[in-house]
C-alpha cells in the first residue's frame, strides 16, 4: 500500500519534495498529503500552501535560556527536565482524507 502522507522534518524540505511528487504525475493533496514542521513564511508562498506545525521558537528560546542560567547558577543541583512547548497548526492546502 503506498503512503498517503509525507511529514517533512521542516518546511524547506517540502519545496524539494513537492517537485519530486509532481514529477511522478501525482497531485497534492488528491493523491498524497504533505505536512511540514516549522511554520516559515515560505511555506505559505508555495503552491499549494503547505499545512505545517509552527514551532513556538520564542518560547523555546526563553525556556532554554532560563534552564541554562539555572545550570550555571546551581551546577550541583540542576536537574534535567523534559519541557514541552506548544505549537500552532497552520492549515494550508496540502492535506485531505485519502
Regions inferred by a protein language model and the residue ranges of each:
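Flexible loop/turn connectors
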Residues: 1-98
Amino acid at each position: 500500500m503506498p503512503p498517503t502522507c509525507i511529514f517533512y522534518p521542516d518546511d524547506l524540505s517540502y519545496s524539494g519534495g513537492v517537485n519530486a511528487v509532481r514529477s511522478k504525475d501525482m497531485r497534492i493533496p488528491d493523491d498524497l498529503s504533505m505536512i511540514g514542521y516549522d511554520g516559515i513564511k515560505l511555506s505559505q508562498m508555495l503552491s499549494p500552501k503547505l499545512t505545517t506545525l509552527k514551532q513556538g521558537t520564542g518560547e523555546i528560546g526563553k525556556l532554554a535560556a532560563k534552564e541554562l542560567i539555572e545550570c550555571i547558577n546551581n551546577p550541583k543541583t540542576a536537574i534535567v527536565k523534559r519541557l514541552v512547548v506548544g505549537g500552532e497548526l497552520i492549515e494550508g492546502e496540502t492535506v485531505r482524507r485519502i
